[in-house]
Amino acid sequence: MVYKARISLSGTENKIVDVVCEEIKGIAKRTGVEIHGPIPLPTKRLVVPVRKSPDGEGSPTWDRWEMRVHKRLIDVDADERTLRQLMRISIPDGVRIEIQIKS
């Protein structure tokens, strides 16, 4: 039976997210299933301004810390063999993966 799997990847390092996308594309190519993506979604930018001086004295100077979250979306028409191989991918730290399966 052929399933439709929607794989969403997110992480703070875009190169690592792209490496995982290439692994998924390689599995899809080897098993001969149809793949759509990776579709780059908008990057979320989280900014936290922090006061440099801990005691509140002196001029108000601020540090701005920033974290960017990169997202990719991949749609795969997958059979059971492909899904098993997708589950066995080693995912590096800092990458979050979600798989939604529709029959």
UniProtKB/Swiss-Prot annotation:
Role summary: Involved in the binding of tRNA to the ribosomes.
Organism: Picrophilus torridus (strain ATCC 700027 / DSM 9790 / JCM 10055 / NBRC 100828 / KAW 2/3)
HAMAP family given in the database record: Ribosomal_uS10
Any Pfam family hit: Ribosomal_S10
Keyword terms: Ribonucleoprotein, Ribosomal protein
InterPro entries from the UniProt entry: Ribosomal_uS10, Ribosomal_uS10_CS, Ribosomal_uS10_dom, Ribosomal_uS10_dom_sf, Ribosomal_uS10_euk/arc
Assigned protein family: Belongs to the universal ribosomal protein uS10 family.
PANTHER family documented for this protein: 30S RIBOSOMAL PROTEIN S10 FAMILY MEMBER
Encoding gene, per UniProt annotation: rps10
Gene3D superfamilies given in the database record: Ribosomal protein S10 domain
Subunit relationships: Part of the 30S ribosomal subunit.
Protein name: Small ribosomal subunit protein uS10
GO cellular component: small ribosomal subunit
GO molecular function, one term: tRNA binding
A biological process term (GO) from this entry: translation
NCBIfam families registered for this protein in UniProt: uS10_euk_arch
